[in-house]
From Swiss-Prot:
This is Inositol-3-phosphate synthase 1. Pathway: Polyol metabolism; myo-inositol biosynthesis; myo-inositol from D-glucose 6-phosphate: step 1/2. It comes from Mus musculus (Mouse). Key enzyme in myo-inositol biosynthesis pathway that catalyzes the conversion of glucose 6-phosphate to 1-myo-inositol 1-phosphate in a NAD-dependent manner. Rate-limiting enzyme in the synthesis of all inositol-containing compounds. NAD(+) binds at residues 67-70, 141, 177-178, 188, 191, 228-231, 278-279, 303, 306, 337-339, 352, 390-391, 419-420. InterPro entries: Myo-inos-1-P_Synthase, Myo-inos-1-P_Synthase_GAPDH, NAD(P)-bd_dom_sf. The gene is Isyna1. It holds the Pfam family Inos-1-P_synth. Residues 512-557 are annotated as: Disordered. One of its GO terms (cellular component) is cytoplasm. Belongs to the myo-inositol 1-phosphate synthase family. It comes from the Eukaryota.
Amino acid sequence: MEPAAEILVDSPDVVYSPETIEARYEYRTTRVSREGGVLRVQPRATRFTFRTARQVPRLGVMLVGWGGNNGSTLTAAVLANRLRLTWPTRTGRKEANYYGSLTQAGTVNLGLDENGREVFVPFSALLPMVAPNDLVFDGWDISSLNLAEAMRRAQVLDCGLQEQLWPHMESLRPRPSVYIPEFIAANQTARADNLIPGTRAQQLEQIRKDIRDFRSSAGLDKVIVLWTANTERFCEVVPGRNDTAENLLHTIQLGLEVSPSTLFAVASILEDCAFLNGSPQNTLVPGALELASQRHVFVGGDDFKSGQTKVKSVLVDFLIGSGLKTMSIVSYNHLGNNDGQNLSAPLQFRSKEVTKSSVVDDMVHSNHVLYAPGERPDHCVVIKYVPYVGDSKRALDEYTSELMLGGTNTLVLHNTCEDSLLAAPIMLDLVLLTELCQRVSFCTDSDPEPQGFHTVLSLLSFLFKAPLVPPGSPVVNALFRQRSCIENIFRACVGLPPQNHMLLEHKMERPGPGIKPGEVVATSPLPCKKEPTPATNGCTGDANGHPQAPTPKLSTA
């Protein structure tokens, strides 16, 4: 991958220093009030000052479930890219890349060049970001297999790549992890040979020691902890037990019910490490969220949005956005990896069902023309375990929508999702974006005291099926709204306006700034153009707005 050109915003509102990028930014919104039968809309503007630290830290990543399919695949991906590996396959030679990563393979539009052409740059070029090849990995797993053996067990990567990675991954071994049998399926017992002993309080302290040991031994500036282990059953929120930070810490000391993932979350927060939950269970109970707020530590979740659900968050947005009333969504999955085996247990499946079913809620609520209050589509989710297909998950969806005048439209989609190869770049983005957000602060003219983002990092919603948001905030699931949020906030950090896709420069009769008078600019090679077809309605222009002779009147004789 070629390095991106340096971006320098030439504006009096943007100041570059060796330490920071400081940008003045006007945030424009509207406030709507109801007065009788009138909706009164008032434009508003707030002046922000964003400061982004330019110094990129040495970053460590600790994965809970490091020896699983996702953990071993992400580790292999970073090593393969760092070593610039290539390997033969039956369809030709392949080389390591970061396809599927928003930050590494996505682009953003900077604007128009002197010829009126759009200029795109890698997402990672907008702001100083940790290079993925520089990440340092460690983690925990209830299975004692080293990462090379875990990679072979996962059966995700080509043999030619596994052989080259083997000597680099063989020395990587997960630390013992927490195993509480009642939280995951009974079929996971056979893997559980690498466990932290003791009480819940002792296990919590051991996790904290592991984080401190990794930080010091690897010479790290920061550590981020990410849960990519088994889906757990939901944990009941009980007043007096896990509803406040104090109660949750007391519950751990007493050895009462706390899920393994919540133990890891609490340990991470106490060590001032951001914690990200890649599974669907309610790891971040109210007490954990309060603890994160008290210590100003980022948390994010829940459940990686990688395959079927990512497609759903695009497709339903398209259907409802097109004015079609989607009334039935039926989603069927079968997969054969360890995630599928764990989800074959009813309580663990229920956790997944909840996150996969809520993904269309905001799109339905956005259109009261189509949906009456309380009305929503029928939504059914089925997951089955089929060992033979391994990590190659099959997803089948049927969407049925109502059309005008009583018609119906049914769309059926088959999607083969390479589960871990889709999840690994999402994990990468979560870590890189979270770290970058830790270096951003801002203030407003009315509140000049610098602050950071809310500790519930909802900016990461693009990457989660059931995104956590601060109390009272709207939950957004529509994929392109989520992506625009990330892009436009980062544009604000360098003083650029939000991407609005208007392209008014190309829609004016007399071209505006950036377009030479009379010049027609094509953004891509065009095929040979047919001669203009005379209009049948008396219009005197072709489809491109070029004048043409009036349509001759046909003789009626």
